[in-house]
Amino acid sequence: MSTNLNPFMNNTPSSSPLKGSESKRVSKRPISSSSSASLLSSPSRRSRPSTVYGDRYIPSRTDIDFNSIVSISSMASVPALNPSSTEDQVEYQKERQAHETYNTLLKNELFGEMLSKDTVGSESSIDRIKNTRPSTRGNVHAENTTRHGYELERVSTPPPEAAGLEEFSPHSTPVTPRRLFTSQQDEITRPSSNSVRGASLLTYQQRKGRRLSAASLLQSQFFDSMSPVRPDSKQLLLSPGKQFRQIAKVPYRVLDAPSLADDFYYSLIDWSSTDVLAVALGKSIFLTDNNTGDVVHLCDTENEYTSLSWIGAGSHLAVGQANGLVEIYDVMKRKCIRTLSGHIDRVACLSWNNHVLTSGSRDHRILHRDVRMPDPFFETIESHTQEVCGLKWNVADNKLASGGNDNVVHVYEGTSKSPILTFDEHKAAVKAMAWSPHKRGVLATGGGTADRRLKIWNVNTSIKMSDIDSGSQICNMVWSKNTNELVTSHGYSKYNLTLWDCNSMDPIAILKGHSFRVLHLTLSNDGTTVVSGAGDETLRYWKLFDKPKAKVQPNSLIFDAFNQIR
C-alpha cells in the first residue's frame, strides 16, 4: 500500500460513502462552447451609471462673525524672550513685527468689508483690528451678546437655495467659475475666436508684446486698481515699518594670535587712547597701530606675561608677570623704564587712575603704586581671602572695584585700605567688572561658571539695580562709551559675546565665532569697536557702535559778544 508523502497534494478526502451511490446516478450532459466560456470566464461587476461631478462648491459667509476676528487674534504668538536662551532681541522684534503685520492683513482681508461699514470718525478697519483684544478661549463661543454693534453669529455655509444656486444633478455639465479679475496676461493668451464646443482648444492668438518683467507683473497684480487686495491692506503693506538697528554679526577683521593664553584669570589685551592695541602672546608683547596697521614687537620675558594695562594718556604700558613683578614700558622708546616689586605670585590684573597704578595678585593682596614715587608701592589692601582676579578704577568718581576668587566684590573710596561696600551675592569668581560711563556710581559685575549672573549695582545707594542669568560663564565685559549698552564675553559653554541693553537688560545681539572661552575683551578709544581674544588663538574685531554725533558749537561771534557784556 503506497502512501503519498506530500500532504498538500492529496489533502481533499475521497467521495463520501453516503453520497457515493448518488454520484453514480448523475448523468453527464453535453456542455456547449458558449456556456463553457461563461463558466470559465472571470466574474465581472455590474456596470453602474456614470456620474459627472461639477467643480468644487465654495462656501460663502452669510454674516461676519466678530468672534472669528477674536479667534484669529488669539492665535499662538512668538514666545517671550528668555535672556539665557534667546539669540537676540533685534531678530525677535523683526519676527514679531512680521507676525503682527501678517495677522492684521489676514483679518482685514477676511473681515475688513464688514468692519468698514461701521467705522466711527476717521478710524479705519486696520485700526479696529489692531485694537481688538483676544478673549479667553472658554468664553468665545459661549457669549451670545452683541459686541461692537455686531450680532455674534457663527460662520456657516448657506444652503444652495439661500445662495441662489441649484443642486448639482448627476448628469449636469461641469462649469468652471469665471474669474473675477483679469490681468494683462489673460488678454495675451485668450482664445482667438468665440469658438463653440468641439473647436480646437489650442487656437490662441500670438503674443503681441514681450514677456513682462517681474516688476510689471507685480504692478499689474498688486498695485493695479483691479487688484483683489483691499486698499487699506495695500496701504498697510506699503507703509514703512519700524526701523531696526543693524548690527554686524561677523567680525570685520580676524587676526591670528598664537600662544594667546587660555587662562580665566589673565587679562592680555588692552586698547590705548592713541589707538594702539597691546597683546601679550606667551612670553612676548606686540603692539598694533590701528591707524596704520603696523605691528611692533615691544618686549620679551623669561617668565609668562599675565596682564597688561595702558595708562590714560597712552604713552606707557604696565605689564604684569607670573613671578609677581610689574614692568612699565615707554612705548615710544620701546624700553622698560621701571620694574616694580611687591607681589610674591602672579599679577593677574592691573588698573590705572592717572599716575596711580593698582595691581592685584594671587597672593590675595592689592597694591597701590604711585609711579612718581621711588617706592614700589605705598598702600597694601588685604580684603580678599583668595586671588584678586579683577580690578577697575572709576576715575571720574575716584572709586575702585575689586573682584576675587572668593566670589566677593569690594568697593573702595580712593586708595583707602577698607572697602566702603561689599557685595557677596555671586557664587563664583568675579573677574568681569565695568563702570558705567553714563551714570555715576553704577557698577556691573559678572560671575564665573557656577554663577553665570550679570548684576548691576548702584554703589552710591547700595542698591542692586539688575540681576540677569546670562546662561554661561562671564569672563569679561566692557561698557560702551557711546550708548548705554554692555558687552559681555562668555566661556563655558557658549563661547560668544552678548550685547545688552542696560535700560531693559534685554540681549540685543549674540556674536558667535570663537570656539574657546572668550577671556579677553577691550574697547577702542572712539567707542565703536570691540576686540575679543580667546583660547582659539584669534583676535576678532567687532563693529558694534556708531561714533557719537558731534555737538553743535554756538556761533562764535554771538558768544564773544555775550562774553563782552559786563
UniProtKB/Swiss-Prot annotation:
GO biological process: anaphase-promoting complex-dependent catabolic process; deactivation of mitotic spindle assembly checkpoint; negative regulation of mitotic spindle pole body separation; positive regulation of anaphase-promoting complex-dependent catabolic process; positive regulation of mitotic actomyosin contractile ring contraction; positive regulation of mitotic metaphase/anaphase transition; positive regulation of protein catabolic process; positive regulation of ubiquitin-dependent protein catabolic process
Keyword Iron applies: no
Modified residues (Phosphoserine): S213
Keyword tags: Cell cycle, Cell division, Cytoplasm, Mitosis, Nucleus, Phosphoprotein, Repeat, WD repeat
Keyword NADP: no
Each WD repeat, start to end: 258-298, 300-339, 342-379, 383-422, 425-467, 469-510, 513-552
Gene3D superfamilies with a match to the protein in the record: YVTN repeat-like/Quinoprotein amine dehydrogenase
Region Disordered: start-end pairs: 1-56
Low complexity: compositionally biased ranges: 29-44
Polar residues bias spans: 1-18
One Gene Ontology MF term: anaphase-promoting complex binding
GO CC list: anaphase-promoting complex; cytoplasm; nucleus
Subcellular location: Cytoplasm; Nucleus
Modified how: Phosphorylated at multiple sites by CDC28, probably in its CLB5 bound form, in S, G2 and M phase of the cell cycle, thereby blocking the association of CDH1 to the APC/C and promoting nuclear export of CDH1 by MSN5. Dephosphorylated and activated by CDC14 in late anaphase, which may be necessary for PSE1-dependent nuclear localization.
Subunit note: Associates with the APC/C complex. Interacts with CLB2, CLB3, CDC5, HSL1, MSN5 and PSE1.
Similarity field: Belongs to the WD repeat CDC20/Fizzy family.
Function according to Swiss-Prot or TrEMBL: Activator protein that regulates the ubiquitin ligase activity and substrate specificity of the anaphase promoting complex/cyclosome (APC/C). During telophase and in the subsequent G1 phase of the cell cycle, recognizes and binds proteins containing a destruction box (D-box) and an additional degradation signal termed the KEN box including ASE1, CDC20, the B-type cyclins CLB2 and CLB3, the polo-like kinase CDC5 and HSL1, and recruits them in a C-box-dependent manner to the APC/C for ubiquitination and subsequent proteolysis.
Domain remark in the UniProt entry: The C-box is required for the association with the APC/C complex.
The name this protein goes by in its record: APC/C activator protein CDH1
